[in-house]
Each structure stands twice: as C-alpha cells, then as structure tokens.
Amino acid sequence: MAITRITAAEAAALIKDGDTLGLSGFTPAGTPKAVTAELAKVAHAEHEAGRPFQVGILTGASTGDSCDGVLSIENAIKYRAPYTTNGEFRKRVNAGLIAYNDIHLSQMAQEIRYGFLGDVDWAILEACAVTDDGKVYLTAAGGISPTVARLAKKGVIIELNAFHSDRSIGIHDVYEPLDPPSRGAIEINSPGDRIGTTYVQVDPKKIVGIVECDIPDEARAFKDSDPVTEQIGQNVADFLMADMKRGIIPSSFLPLQSGVGSTANAILGALGSNPAVPAFNVYTEVLQDAVVDLMRQGRVKTASTCSLTVTNEVLKGIYDDIDQFKDRLVLRPSEISNNPEIIRKLGLIAINTAIEVDLYGNVNSTHICGTKMMNGIGGSGDFERNAFLSIFTCPSVAKGGSISSIVPFCSHLDHTEHDVNVVITEQGVADLRGKSPAQRAQLIIENCAHPDYKQLLWDYLKIAEKGQTCHKLSAAFAMHDTFLREGNMMKTNFAEYVK
C-alpha cells in the first residue's frame, strides 16, 4: 500500500501547541526544512490570532535557518535540546525566552528512551528514499532518527528531499543499542566496521504522509584560515609528530576526531600535508570539506561520522563519485558516532575548540563571560573525556586582543582539568599530562598565553592563596569583570579585588 503524499503545509497543520518534535539530522545536514518552515507560518498565524503556539524540539545537534531560525523568530520554541548554532535561537536563549537543555550529544537518544525528556509526539525525518514497507533511507546525517521514529506517539512525517541522491543508499549504518540492563558491547572495533542496517525501519502505519521537496542543505562554508589558525594547526601537527617519535602514538597513527571550523581545517591540512604522518582513519561526529579532500587524496583511509556537514558543492561531488566513497564512508546515529565505549576502545586523538582555558587546564567551551550561551557543549565532552589523547585549541586572544583566552579561572566549566591532556594556541603547546596544578599553570602561561597577558597572569598567581590549586577567590574573575566594565581585560588591576 502506497504511503500518502501530503504538502508541507498539511503536515504542519497536524502539529499542535505543546507538541514535542523529534527531528532527523545533525547540524544542518539531514534536518527537515519544508515542514518546519511551514510550522513557523502556523505559529505566526496563531500568535496573530492571540492564541499560544509553541513546540518542543529534540534534535541530534544543530539545525539550519529553516528550523531553529524561523521557529525562533516566530517565538515558536518552548524547549529545545541539545546543541545549536543558530543566531536567532541564541538571542532568545540568552534573553531567557527559550528553555535550552545542553546535553552531551552521545546521551541524547538514550535520554529520550529513558523518558527523561518527556514524550515525542511527532518525528520528522528527511530521506532520500522510502519504501512502502517503511524503510526510510536518511540523507546526510544519522542523528537521533531511529529513536524518535520508533517512539513518536502521534506519527512520523517524511520529507522526501530530491536534492539528495538515492545513490547514497548504503552509506548509513543504523544501529540502536538496547537499554540497561540488557545492553551489550557495541561491536565496532575499527572506524569502518558496520553493525546495523542501511535504513531506519518505521512501522508504515505510523507514517502519516510523505512531503516531497527539493531543498539544499543549509551548511555554511567556514571562513578561510588565517596566520593564527594556520599556526595552531602546525603546532598540533608538530606535537603529534613528537609523540609519534617518542613512541606514545603508534607509528600507524590513531583515529582522529576533530571539531569544525577554520582551525579544524588548518589542523587537518597540516596533518594531511605532512609526509611523516601515515594515511589515517577518522572517527568523528561531523565531517567537513577538508576530510573529503583528504579522502580523495588517499590521506584519509576511512571516515566514520554522524553527518556530512559539507558545502553543497562537496556533497554533490560525494554523490557523483559515490563508488569512491561508499566503502570508505560510514554515517552513524549520534549515540554511536559519539559513544564513549567506542571512543575509548579505538583510542582516538580528540581535538576540539575552547572559548577559554584557565591556569589549571579547565576548559569553557560554551559560555561568554560565564552567562551568555554561545552554542553548546556538542560532542566535545563525549570525545575529550574518553580519548586516548585529549587536545583543546584556541587563539590566545579574541576581540582584537581585548580578551585573553587564558584566564585565572574559567567563567563556566564544561571540561575539567581531569579531562584535558594538552592545550594548544598559536603561541605554543602546554602538555599537561602528569603535571600538578602548579606545573600546569606555569606551562599554560609560558607556552600558551599571549605575551600581552603573561605578566598579568603571573601577577594573579602572586596574590593567589596557597593550596593544591592556588586561587584568590575575590580576584578569580577580575579579568572577566574588567572586560564587562571597561571592554578590555588588559586594564585589569588585581589590587582592586584583593580584600
């Protein structure tokens, strides 16, 4: 029996105030775009009529403007989890208008299954193909699709997006683990292993309709690297090469996980162009253009990811050359791509971005000056805590030098000193392995802080009260406070904070 075709507007009309939506995708890759855009129109009309209309949003990670963006503008999001990068959403979260739950991405699907986040009313999945018996072939991301499709109480809506070629069928490995106490080992022992199906199986009776559309992904090209990011990339490559020469990293190398953005591109470029680095595997949550280039060059052998967060030109190139990629590229649900068991088993080298790092190696990767959410923790906690080698990178300064990324005490903590092995800026490398707090502070100031801030950070240590971890609590956030008052951390005078 053929599944009914409906319009995006008809699908949106099914969704009621207070419903919770579980969406496919992970980053803008693979996320619904047609139905959510129509849902924003519904919210606008309801609000104009004086009626409430807000929904809960559960996703794999961030979405694009046609979801988080338009729904935020129309004040249509009551609650959302987890990670997001949308500017309109960010404004409203920081204004206290949206309840935002910043969950580790590996935990998202299981927290839904455990009932921690309430019921899922509707699942909306983007697909490149769907069969009458309910086999849904996802597009450019795995996300939380298997879980929300299975648990959706009111029904499943499929966006059949012609932009995505059905030639990509076969790159997904869809696997949903059992919940405790029945969960067993996840039998992935190398990045290319496959343990699931190539599709999400949905009870066809639950599919209320298929919305046909042809809408490109909303992934953005990252800005070009600059001398600072290039130097960070080179510092990372040099550090890893030194660890290889010491025999800490095996000569065959280890699978790499890297975040996204210009710094990640610079790191991958430096590793890929270094002849001393053997061809390596990638086990990550997000694949960007640089990895695809390295796969074409033979520098990356196999890549496992949750999403293809690439430009549309690169995505089309993958589809056109799918025979080159199908056996070397695996897309997984986020609870598998980010799974701590697998990360530790494979021995990943994890490289992620910090907003700020304090003198003892704690990392803030989510908040500006302790209060304003930037994006969220994403998968960085999944990877960094469980990796063979945990690396955080950042420029030593921001805002033209008015902010030091190295501070006495992080204004928000996402990754504790116990989970951070190495800190790298364009200034150098602080290898924190085996070091005491006092030793870490010395290394971070000397090797990672910008020269304009080194003396200020030494001055803080002079007034810090002695202990295992030396601090002066009245002055620990003096640099942040000075920035908020005067717009420049360099104007900090610790004497004003000593009582």
Identify what each model region corresponds to.
Residues 1-499:
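Conserved alpha/beta enzyme-core scaffold
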